[in-house]
């Protein structure tokens, strides 16, 4: 079956290249990014550590299917809590980020620099629409110093909201998210359980642009096996190229790294050899283990097939952050966020982290000349037709722009598998 799929991909490739009669323009030169300051580099490392601990906490939640979080944005949310909190409320936020030994000004300046660097979509040649807004009850007034500092470091907006009219309040939140993401994320949530505290909302749309694009004609409808007995139809895009690749035969998994345009970041995909729950792979996944796997990767010819489309995911991170140690800020009776409002009358009721993540064919022109090379005649097959884990990694700092898993893409049921 896989051999037939590989043959099909090459037939598509041959037809696509035949139609591409013009010699493509040279690919864009690799981008440049300013070197991070020592404090920002330290926080890049800490945010990468946070990525794995948060992912593991979320993966254990049986109610969660697809996972999609931006660790650097979560780190900024913790920085915001630290900025607006006092005493244990503030120190817990720094502790979750493993930044207890850093001075407050180092944390805020470092996180601000890191966020600006990683979300610079022009330098990275990716599409990343990002907005953060702190909603407070209508009875709360945000302190001027907090508003100014949170805008400076975290580009966070502030707004009062009246939940006596919950329908109107939800509409306001969702309209802001849609506007922030140019309509790519039309809805953050359908409901808010706790309406007597502050709501921190992150709304994002991210679309990577490949260092070498997929040909737009190499797209077709295929099956994605959610489980061995449940398959949904999705659009799949295909290409063959030279990529960093490693096949861990002992642990029965593959890993491939696909550079994004300007080569300042890359998409890394980890996938078990066969259809299975991701629990086994997730138990292996740590910051250290990822480094080991990447150290074993070699440049190889790989025929890649990926789902094409948009994944929309909203998480309320409140309970997951609480599990990592952020217990006071979310407790109405214990929270001290008095630097936010000047009064000890506020707690963090929800942390909505909403993202639309699009995989498409767009990218730099590919070099047609490589397809005559001998090494591309027998490529490794990376056919992402079952659940996998993925990361978007900054090549300079090792910080993670995103970490997630795709378990159930959008699509209609196709058939039952034996």
UniProtKB/Swiss-Prot annotation:
SMART domains: SERPIN
Keywords: Acetylation, Chaperone, Endoplasmic reticulum, Glycoprotein, Osteogenesis imperfecta, Phosphoprotein, Signal, Stress response
Phosphoserine, modified sites: 141
GO biological process: chondrocyte development involved in endochondral bone morphogenesis; collagen biosynthetic process; collagen fibril organization; protein maturation; response to unfolded protein
Chain positions carrying an annotated carbohydrate: 120, 125
Signal sequence, renumbered to the chain: 1-18
Keyword Ribonucleoprotein among record annotations: no
InterPro entries xref list: Serpin_CS, Serpin_dom, Serpin_fam, Serpin_H1_serpin_dom, Serpin_sf, Serpin_sf_1, Serpin_sf_2
Motif Prevents secretion from ER mapped to chain: 415-418
Top-rank taxon, per record: Eukaryota
Annotated compartments: Endoplasmic reticulum lumen
Gene induction: By heat shock.
GO molecular function annotations of the record: collagen binding; RNA binding; serine-type endopeptidase inhibitor activity; unfolded protein binding
Keyword Acetylation: yes
GO cellular component, one term: endoplasmic reticulum-Golgi intermediate compartment
Sites bearing N6-acetyllysine, chain numbering: 207, 319
Site keyed Reactive bond homolog: positions: 377-378
Pfam families hit by this protein: Serpin
N6-succinyllysine modification, residue list: 94, 296
Family: Belongs to the serpin family.
Record disease entry: Osteogenesis imperfecta 10: A form of osteogenesis imperfecta, a disorder of bone formation characterized by low bone mass, bone fragility and susceptibility to fractures after minimal trauma. Disease severity ranges from very mild forms without fractures to intrauterine fractures and perinatal lethality. Extraskeletal manifestations, which affect a variable number of patients, are dentinogenesis imperfecta, hearing loss, and blue sclerae.
Purpose of the protein: Binds specifically to collagen. Could be involved as a chaperone in the biosynthetic pathway of collagen.
Protein name: Serpin H1
Organism per entry: Homo sapiens
């Amino acid at each position: 079956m896989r051999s037939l799929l590989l043959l099909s991909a090459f037939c598509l490739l041959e037809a696509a290249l035949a139609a591409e009669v013009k010699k493509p323009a040279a690919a864009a030169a690799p981008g440049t990014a300013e070197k991070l300051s020592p404090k920002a580099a330290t926080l890049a490392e800490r945010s990468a550590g946070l990525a794995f601990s948060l992912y593991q906490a979320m993966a254990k939640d049986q109610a969660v299917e697809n996972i999609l979080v931006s660790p650097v944005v979560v780190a900024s949310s913790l920085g915001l809590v630290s900025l607006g909190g006092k005493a244990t409320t503030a120190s817990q936020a720094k502790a979750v980020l493993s930044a207890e030994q850093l001075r407050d000004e180092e944390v805020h300046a470092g996180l601000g620099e890191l966020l600006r660097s990683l979300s610079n979509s022009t330098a990275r040649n990716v599409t990343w629409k990002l907005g953060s807004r702190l909603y407070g009850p209508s009875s709360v007034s945000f302190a001027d110093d907090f508003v100014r500092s949170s805008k400076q470091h975290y580009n966070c907006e502030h707004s009062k909201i009246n939940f006596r009219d919950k329908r109107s309040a939800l509409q306001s939140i969702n309209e802001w998210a849609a506007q922030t993401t140019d309509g790519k994320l039309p809805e953050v949530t359908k409901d808010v359980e706790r309406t007597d505290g502050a709501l921190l909302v992150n709304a994002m749309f991210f679309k990577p642009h490949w260092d070498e694009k997929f040909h737009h004609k190499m797209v077709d409808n295929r099956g994605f096996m959610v489980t061995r007995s449940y398959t949904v139809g999705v659009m799949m895009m295909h290409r063959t190229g030279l990529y960093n690749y490693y096949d861990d035969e002992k642990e029965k998994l593959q890993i491939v790294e696909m550079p994004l345009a300007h080569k300042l970041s890359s998409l890394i995909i980890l996938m078990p050899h066969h259809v299975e729950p991701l629990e086994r792979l997730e138990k292996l996944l740590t910051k250290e283990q990822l480094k080991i796997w990447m150290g074993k990767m070699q440049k190889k010819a790989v025929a890649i097939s990926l789902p094409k489309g948009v994944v929309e995911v909203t998480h309320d991170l409140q309970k997951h952050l609480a599990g990592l140690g952020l217990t006071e800020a979310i407790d109405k009776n214990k929270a001290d966020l008095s630097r936010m409002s000047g009064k000890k009358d506020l707690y963090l009721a929800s942390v909505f982290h909403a993202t639309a993540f699009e995989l498409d064919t767009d990218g730099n022109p590919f070099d047609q000349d490589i397809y005559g090379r001998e090494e591309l005649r027998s490529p490794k097959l990376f056919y992402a037709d079952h659940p996998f884990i993925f990361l978007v990694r900054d090549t300079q700092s090792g910080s993670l722009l995103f970490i997630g898993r795709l378990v159930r893409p959008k699509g209609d049921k196709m058939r039952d598998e034996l």
